[in-house]
């Protein structure tokens, strides 16, 4: 164990690591685990064996159990009430959430909207550190997780540009695209098509990192008198229903 305990009422800059006798360095969340670890090791000479990730993200999205439980409960109610309609996710990434849609409703159409290339530095207003996020995916990675990939309709590109020729009703939708424009466009596109008893999940509503998600939701709900229900997952997702 370290011999010195330092009580400090503020935030220490990373360069102070060299001056501190410590046992472990704990990365609170895994969002930037690779980047932080790289800086600690290569810039500040930290022994990688002393780096611990408090909330490792090594098993898909199991750290968001509340969101998954809510999805299962909503699907259970939909089946009990025989709620019919297609399904969609905007912002699929590697398909961890969308695969649950396909697992519980393998016979229904599932539209998958994503660039499958991460953020665009010119088009998407994101922090520079986010530019390389979400690039480690592909259509094959997503479809290989699906119980019935034949009912998955992939729309590669920018939403809502890729939402052409879709006229059916929707029962279950997930919006997980982190940015103001696609979140607002997703609500504007899917809410009128949402059947009574259907649900729209919006991720990152309470995220401090993607604050424009909340802005887009409030703007849409204010214009349409839509009601939201908050979840207790780590990013404070919300559900919109009719």
How should these model regions be labeled?
Residues 1-31:
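A solvent-exposed beta-alpha-beta segment
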Residues 2-7, 32-37, 121, 210:
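Short, charged/polar "capping" segments at the starts of alpha-helices
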Residues 5, 41-52, 224-225:
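Structural alpha-beta junctions
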Residues 21-26, 49-51, 109-110:
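Hydrophobic beta-strand segments of well-ordered beta-sheets in folded domains
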Residues 31-32, 94:
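Gly/Ser/Thr-rich loops at beta-strand to alpha-helix junctions
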Residues 35-43, 155:
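Structural/interface elements that position substrates and couple domains in central-metabolism enzymes
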Residues 53-65, 72, 81-242:
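S-adenosylmethionine/decaboxylated-SAM
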Residues 74-76:
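Pre-Walker A adenine-sensing motif
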